[in-house]
Amino acid sequence: VTEQRWNLVADIGGTNARFAALREGQLESEFEFYHSVEEYPQFSDLIIKLRDEIALATGFVGAPHSVCLAVACPADVEHISFTNSHWEFTKTHLLEWFDCQELVVINDFEAVAHGITELGADDCIKIGGGEPQAHKPVGILGAGTGLGMAALISHSDGYHVLDTEGGHADFAPVGQRQMDVLTCLRQNFKRVSLERVLSGKGIVNIYNAICQMEGTDPTLTTPPDVVTAALANSNPQALTALDTFCESMGAAAGNLALTLGARGGIYIAGGVVPRFSEFFVNSGFREKFEDKGRFASYLEPIPVYLVTRNNLGLLGAAKKLQNN
């Protein structure tokens, strides 16, 4: 049994809650814990179970010294309410529940951005472009239960993370098929944000729209169903849907690169795209990324990296504590 200071980091999305118990100063841990959000009516129910789990697995005694939670919703408020799940809590309650000395709550994509700074060459697949320019902005977007966006801005002390809610900007269709998809989605949603298209659920939304456009009944109901059918080439609507997803991601990534002047590169993170990374690399993603008329030549040299490393959010949350 070790009487040493330890920290707890978490990456809490709409579907999964991931935790790691770290010795102080560590960025990575062999002690990781995974839970499904829907299994727990309240976050506090999970904390009770987590305490026992951590004590049993690690031998760490007592409360964590520092806790960093990366959450899939705006984090700079006292009352945390998740965009894509039923969980909510206050920072005051968190301090009570964890009994920690330091509590940091950040947006999940701010954590991803911190994690990007620790990636090695083996953690990414490069999709076109040249070399990243030093000290230029880096754009990050990633599809999971929702769509996250963030940026890394270089400054004299290292870098600053710009966390955003860019995933809730309007979906801007490119080409007739995307316009038709938007028309279909408008029948179901008062407003169609990027997240309605570029997320796990977004893949199903696109698939349902394609079925409606082609006059066929949708038979697939979950993101893995659609992806599996597309990769097996067993369902033409699923294949069209995944193509449309990749092209829409390319257009959105190109828009982000233009908006930020992201000559330091664009990173595609999140849990969705790595499930079909080979398909994504060979899709129309890069073509749509560069397809910006007079500014195609601006985008051509910008590299895009598909992040293949697991648990980037946990790494980033640990990095945030280290930076503090």
What does each of the following model-derived ranges do?
Residues 102-133, 224-236, 243-246, 251:
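ATP-dependent carbohydrate kinase catalytic cores
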Residues 1-55, 59, 63, 180-324:
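ATP-binding/phosphotransfer module of carbohydrate and carboxylate kinases, centering on a glycine-rich
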Residues 57-105, 113-123, 140, 275-278:
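Short beta-strand-loop/turn "lid" adjacent to the catalytic site in phosphate-handling enzymes
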Residues 126-194, 278, 284-290, 294-296:
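Glycine-rich phosphate-binding loop of actin/hexokinase-like ATP-binding domains
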Residues 21-22, 48, 80-82, 117-118, ...:
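Short amphipathic alpha-helical segments
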Residues 17, 74-76, 146-150, 205, ...:
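Short, acidic Gly/Pro/Ser/Thr-rich loop/turn segments
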Residues 7-11, 66-68, 104, 138-142, ...:
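Short glycine-aspartate micro-motif
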Residues 37, 82-85, 104-111, 130-133, ...:
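Active-site nucleophile and cofactor-binding loops and adjacent substrate-binding regions
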